[in-house]
Regions:
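Cys-dependent protein tyrosine phosphatase-like superfamily
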Residues: 2-171, 184-281
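Histidine-centered active-site/metal-ligand motif
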Residues: 174
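Ser/Thr-glycine-rich phosphate-binding loops at phosphate-binding pockets of nucleotides
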Residues: 177, 181-182
């Protein structure tokens, strides 16, 4: 029977030396900053700036960054982050993941908001019961994982918003691959700022063009299963957003009743992270 990586091995991600290059983005003007930031030790590091939110105002560049884990950053990468004036990181990785690949960035505040990865454990449970996991099984597991973000992980996402509302100091939030926990967090932030849902989905799917899966990771699992587990799909994020709508009556209700982001807090979020109207566009 083929085996999937255990949760502990999933945490043990080998470093990589693939440098990501700026990804052309048709939504950006020619003089706009690069969305994807080239780092030797993180392939999925990118800026949420430039999208158009409430009132036609643009999300500020160089304030909100999403990424895969930061434990493999090189000294040159550290210099890039210093140049970006990164002041704090938010780490969504579970305890084993963050312990296996810990990091510390000089002068940068570290905020762990643990969301334990469950999809690998559930896949292992299926295998132990005698079921050979298929790609479709993996899709269902991923959708269930995203549904769990909406309620089970709500306190962690509330913690992220609390930090963002405290100041607009440049912030990197990340998990291991920067695609699922980080992807839902980025979607919440952008939608709270008024970025249209189709644009949010566009940003979410950029992971498939950028993220480099660590070499040798999960090689005993079928390739089609690995493709599901290490990439993102529209249906994954839609599963979470559907839960927000059906269970909570929409984004505004979810933000206020579940995450504690009321109208005043949403207004402050916009003040901190959207360019003034005269500077938008």
């Amino acid at each position: 029977m083929s085996s999937l990586p255990t949760p502990s091995s999933a945490a043990s991600l080998p470093t990589h030396s693939i440098t990501s290059h700026a990804l052309p983005d048709a939504t950006l003007g020619g003089s706009a900053p690069s969305r994807s930031i080239a780092l030797a030790g993180a392939s999925n590091f990118r800026d949420l700036g430039g999208y158009i939110g409430h009132g036609g105002q643009q999300v500020k560049w160089r304030r909100l960054f999403r990424s895969d884990h930061l434990a493999a950053l090189t000294p040159q990468d550290h210099a890039v982050l210093a140049g970006l004036r990164v002041a704090r990181t938010v780490d969504f990785r579970g305890q084993a993941e963050s312990a296996a690949y810990a990091y510390a960035l000089p002068g940068v505040a570290y905020h762990p908001l643990r969301i334990e990865p469950t999809v690998i454990q559930r896949a292992l449970d299926l295998q132990r019961s005698g079921h050979q996991i298929t790609a479709q099984d993996a899709v269902v597991l991923m959708q269930d994982t995203y549904r769990g973000f909406v309620n089970d992980s709500a306190p962690r996402f509330a913690g992220l918003f609390e930090l963002l509302l405290d100041s607009d100091a440049p912030t990197v939030f990340h998990c291991t691959a920067g695609k699922d926990r980080t992807g839902f967090a980025a979607a919440l932030i952008l939608m709270a700022l008024g970025v249209p849902r189709d644009v949010v989905m566009h940003d979410y799917l950029l992971t498939n063009a950028l993220y480099q899966r660590p070499q040798g990771m999960g090689t005993h699992a079928p390739d089609d299963v690995l493709t599901v587990l290490w990439r993102v799909q529209v249906d994954f994020l839609e599963a979470a957003l559907h839960g927000v709508e059906v269970e909570h009556g929409g984004l505004d209700n979810y933000l206020e009743r579940v995450l504690g982001i009321n109208a005043a807090a949403q207004k402050r979020l916009a003040l901190l992270y959207l360019e003034p109207s005269s500077a938008a566009g």
